Amino acid sequence: MRQKRAKSYRKQLLVYSHTFKFREPYQVLVDNQLVLECNNSNFNLPSGLKRTLQADVKVMITQCCIQALYETRNDGAINLAKQFERRRCNHSFKDPKSPAECIESVVNISGANKHRYVVASQDIDLRRKLRTVPGVPLIHLTRSVMVMEPLSTASAKASKITEEQKLYKGLNDPNIEKLQESGDGSGKESITKKRKLGPKAPNPLSVKKKKKVNSPSDEVKDKEDTSKEKKKRRRRKHKSNTNVPVSNGTTAAQ
């Protein structure tokens, strides 16, 4: 993958993770057409998805897509699909839905991607329908190159609304004035209320140190200490020199 494309994919995934709460490992729903295409072109589907999303993935397939693969009797594609986790779609085995209808019913729940699926499909009509659902990353294979589609209009609009709500949350809230007047009920003042500033203390480095004033008791103690020190001092004794010569040339008697 080229560096420019990888950087673009990282930006898109950041939007999906911040706005729509996508988390690793990403759950990727694949359809029968993509499995057949990967099997025919010898494309490693799990590693391709991991390389495109730049994270760990959990590849999943619905029961209706498996039923569609059984009808093709392509053993290679069937064995490849059996390696993936089976996603229950709650559709009957006897009367399965088409893969496109099945995936759309699993992903689009009341107009939202509730389970945060990444859809990898070769069905153009299915991808067109899922672009109207906010927060659905779409992946397809083009000439043996796995491509993730740019952010859809619905996803970009939902992301913009979410960011604006985060930015202006609380500023336009009508209950803010009431909270400022009455408080929040617990005795605490509102967060937006300004804190009163008192007089500033002087710079401790520019203030002169106070002179220590000795009390009479301290002076008496100092005098006692000095007198004790004087008493403890010893007087050095000088030894007399017995070998001092006398004027007549004899030494003094010891």
Curated annotation (Swiss-Prot):
Residues 241-254 have a biased composition (Polar residues). The keyword Endoplasmic reticulum does not apply. The modification Phosphoserine is found at S182. Residues 229-240 have a biased composition (Basic residues). GO terms for biological process: endonucleolytic cleavage in 5'-ETS of tricistronic rRNA transcript (SSU-rRNA, 5.8S rRNA, LSU-rRNA); endonucleolytic cleavage in ITS1 to separate SSU-rRNA from 5.8S rRNA and LSU-rRNA from tricistronic rRNA transcript (SSU-rRNA, 5.8S rRNA, LSU-rRNA); endonucleolytic cleavage to generate mature 5'-end of SSU-rRNA from (SSU-rRNA, 5.8S rRNA, LSU-rRNA); maturation of SSU-rRNA; maturation of SSU-rRNA from tricistronic rRNA transcript (SSU-rRNA, 5.8S rRNA, LSU-rRNA). Keywords: Mitochondrion, Nucleus, Phosphoprotein, Ribosome biogenesis, RNA-binding, rRNA processing. Residues 175-192, 218-228 have a biased composition (Basic and acidic residues). It is found in: Mitochondrion; Nucleus, Nucleolus. One of its GO terms (molecular function) is small ribosomal subunit rRNA binding. Its main location: mitochondrion. Residues 172-254 are annotated as: Disordered. The keyword Lipoprotein does not apply. SUPFAM superfamilies: PIN domain-like. GO terms for cellular component: mitochondrion; nucleolus; nucleoplasm; small-subunit processome. InterPro entries: Fcf1/Utp23, PIN-like_dom_sf. CDD domains: PIN_ScUtp23p-like. Present with 6960 molecules/cell in log phase SD medium. Involved in rRNA-processing and ribosome biogenesis. Belongs to the UTP23/FCF1 family. UTP23 subfamily. PANTHER family: RRNA-PROCESSING PROTEIN UTP23 HOMOLOG. This is rRNA-processing protein UTP23. It comes from Saccharomyces cerevisiae (strain ATCC 204508 / S288c). The lineage of its organism: Eukaryota, Fungi, Dikarya, Ascomycota, Saccharomycotina. The gene is UTP23.
